[in-house]
Protein backbone atom coordinates (compact mmCIF):
# COMPACT_ATOMS: atom_id res chain seq x y z
CA UNK A 1 0.00 0.00 0.00
CA UNK A 2 2.84 2.39 0.86
CA UNK A 3 4.36 1.74 -2.54
CA UNK A 4 1.12 2.78 -4.30
CA UNK A 5 0.85 5.87 -2.12
CA UNK A 6 4.42 6.82 -3.01
CA UNK A 7 3.76 6.34 -6.73
CA UNK A 8 0.57 8.41 -6.49
CA UNK A 9 2.33 11.26 -4.65
CA UNK A 10 5.20 11.20 -7.16
CA UNK A 11 2.79 11.31 -10.10
CA UNK A 12 0.87 14.25 -8.63
CA UNK A 13 4.11 16.10 -7.87
CA UNK A 14 5.38 15.65 -11.41
CA UNK A 15 2.09 16.75 -12.92
CA UNK A 16 2.31 19.99 -10.94
CA UNK A 17 5.88 20.71 -12.04
CA UNK A 18 6.72 24.32 -12.83
CA UNK A 19 7.04 25.46 -16.43
CA UNK A 20 10.49 24.51 -17.68
CA UNK A 21 10.67 27.01 -20.54
CA UNK A 22 13.31 29.69 -20.00
CA UNK A 23 11.50 32.71 -21.44
CA UNK A 24 14.54 34.98 -21.07
CA UNK A 25 16.33 32.57 -23.43
CA UNK A 26 13.37 32.65 -25.84
CA UNK A 27 13.54 36.46 -25.89
CA UNK A 28 17.29 36.45 -26.52
CA UNK A 29 16.77 34.27 -29.62
CA UNK A 30 13.77 36.18 -31.00
CA UNK A 31 15.62 38.83 -33.01
CA UNK A 32 17.72 36.47 -35.11
CA UNK A 33 14.69 34.29 -35.84
CA UNK A 34 12.53 37.32 -36.76
CA UNK A 35 15.26 38.73 -39.01
CA UNK A 36 15.73 35.38 -40.74
CA UNK A 37 12.02 35.25 -41.62
CA UNK A 38 12.25 38.64 -43.44
CA UNK A 39 8.61 39.58 -42.89
CA UNK A 40 6.79 41.80 -45.36
CA UNK A 41 3.89 43.88 -44.04
CA UNK A 42 1.16 41.76 -45.71
CA UNK A 43 2.77 38.47 -44.66
CA UNK A 44 3.23 39.59 -41.07
CA UNK A 45 -0.32 40.96 -40.86
CA UNK A 46 -1.71 37.59 -41.96
CA UNK A 47 0.63 35.63 -39.70
CA UNK A 48 -0.28 37.65 -36.60
CA UNK A 49 -3.97 36.75 -36.71
CA UNK A 50 -4.88 34.51 -33.78
CA UNK A 51 -5.06 34.20 -30.02
CA UNK A 52 -2.02 34.70 -27.81
CA UNK A 53 -1.43 34.03 -24.14
CA UNK A 54 0.79 36.41 -22.17
CA UNK A 55 3.87 34.58 -20.89
CA UNK A 56 6.63 36.85 -19.63
CA UNK A 57 7.92 40.37 -19.04
CA UNK A 58 11.46 41.60 -18.59
CA UNK A 59 12.83 45.09 -18.05
CA UNK A 60 16.07 46.76 -17.09
CA UNK A 61 16.65 49.92 -15.11
CA UNK A 62 18.97 51.64 -12.70
CA UNK A 63 17.82 49.30 -9.95
CA UNK A 64 18.74 46.22 -11.97
CA UNK A 65 16.67 43.83 -14.00
CA UNK A 66 13.09 42.75 -13.48
CA UNK A 67 11.39 39.67 -14.87
CA UNK A 68 8.10 37.92 -14.17
CA UNK A 69 6.02 35.03 -15.46
CA UNK A 70 3.02 36.02 -13.32
CA UNK A 71 2.34 39.78 -13.68
CA UNK A 72 -0.25 39.31 -16.44
CA UNK A 73 -1.08 35.63 -16.06
CA UNK A 74 -4.40 34.88 -17.72
CA UNK A 75 -4.21 37.80 -20.16
CA UNK A 76 -4.93 36.95 -23.79
CA UNK A 77 -4.50 38.99 -26.93
CA UNK A 78 -6.82 38.28 -29.85
CA UNK A 79 -5.89 39.73 -33.25
CA UNK A 80 -8.69 39.23 -35.75
CA UNK A 81 -8.26 39.31 -39.56
CA UNK A 82 -10.90 42.08 -39.78
CA UNK A 83 -8.43 44.38 -37.93
CA UNK A 84 -10.22 44.20 -34.57
CA UNK A 85 -8.50 43.14 -31.38
CA UNK A 86 -9.23 42.49 -27.74
CA UNK A 87 -7.10 42.03 -24.66
CA UNK A 88 -8.78 39.91 -22.02
CA UNK A 89 -7.77 39.22 -18.46
CA UNK A 90 -9.49 36.70 -16.22
CA UNK A 91 -12.32 36.30 -18.75
CA UNK A 92 -12.95 40.06 -18.77
CA UNK A 93 -12.38 42.27 -21.81
CA UNK A 94 -9.96 44.99 -20.72
CA UNK A 95 -9.28 46.59 -24.09
CA UNK A 96 -10.77 46.28 -27.54
CA UNK A 97 -10.74 48.21 -30.78
CA UNK A 98 -9.07 48.25 -34.15
CA UNK A 99 -5.48 47.39 -34.98
CA UNK A 100 -3.21 47.90 -37.93
CA UNK A 101 0.39 47.11 -38.63
CA UNK A 102 2.68 50.11 -38.67
CA UNK A 103 5.86 49.70 -40.70
CA UNK A 104 8.91 51.88 -40.28
CA UNK A 105 11.94 51.43 -42.48
CA UNK A 106 13.28 48.61 -40.30
CA UNK A 107 10.59 47.44 -37.91
CA UNK A 108 6.88 46.87 -37.28
CA UNK A 109 4.59 47.88 -34.44
CA UNK A 110 0.89 47.69 -33.69
CA UNK A 111 -1.18 50.81 -34.19
CA UNK A 112 -4.13 50.54 -31.77
CA UNK A 113 -7.23 52.62 -30.98
CA UNK A 114 -6.46 52.31 -27.27
CA UNK A 115 -3.09 52.32 -25.58
CA UNK A 116 -2.27 48.90 -24.07
CA UNK A 117 0.93 48.82 -22.02
CA UNK A 118 1.74 45.17 -22.78
CA UNK A 119 1.59 45.89 -26.53
CA UNK A 120 4.04 48.81 -26.71
CA UNK A 121 7.20 48.53 -28.76
CA UNK A 122 8.50 46.91 -31.90
CA UNK A 123 6.96 43.63 -32.98
CA UNK A 124 9.38 40.74 -33.03
CA UNK A 125 7.59 37.63 -34.29
CA UNK A 126 9.01 34.14 -34.38
CA UNK A 127 6.12 31.67 -34.29
CA UNK A 128 4.71 30.79 -31.86
CA UNK A 129 6.15 33.72 -29.91
CA UNK A 130 5.23 37.38 -30.31
CA UNK A 131 7.35 39.92 -28.45
CA UNK A 132 6.67 43.60 -27.97
CA UNK A 133 10.22 44.93 -27.78
CA UNK A 134 10.14 48.14 -25.78
CA UNK A 135 13.53 48.07 -24.06
CA UNK A 136 15.22 50.44 -26.58
CA UNK A 137 13.14 53.23 -24.99
CA UNK A 138 13.64 51.85 -21.45
CA UNK A 139 10.30 50.06 -21.39
CA UNK A 140 9.50 46.43 -20.63
CA UNK A 141 9.57 43.66 -23.22
CA UNK A 142 6.41 41.52 -23.17
CA UNK A 143 6.25 38.01 -24.60
CA UNK A 144 3.06 36.32 -25.82
CA UNK A 145 2.64 32.78 -27.14
CA UNK A 146 0.22 31.88 -29.94
CA UNK A 147 -2.26 29.11 -29.20
Task: Identify the residue ranges that each predicted region occupies.
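Positively charged n-region of N-terminal signal peptides that target proteins for export
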Residues: 1-4
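Hydrophobic alpha-helical targeting segments used for export or membrane insertion
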Residues: 6-10
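C-terminal motif of bacterial Sec signal peptides marking the signal peptidase cleavage site
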Residues: 12-15
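Lipid interaction determinants
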Residues: 17-94, 107-147
Amino acid sequence: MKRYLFIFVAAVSLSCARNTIDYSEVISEMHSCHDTLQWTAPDLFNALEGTYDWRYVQAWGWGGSYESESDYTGWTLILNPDSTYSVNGADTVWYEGNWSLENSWYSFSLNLDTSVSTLWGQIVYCPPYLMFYNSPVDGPDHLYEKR
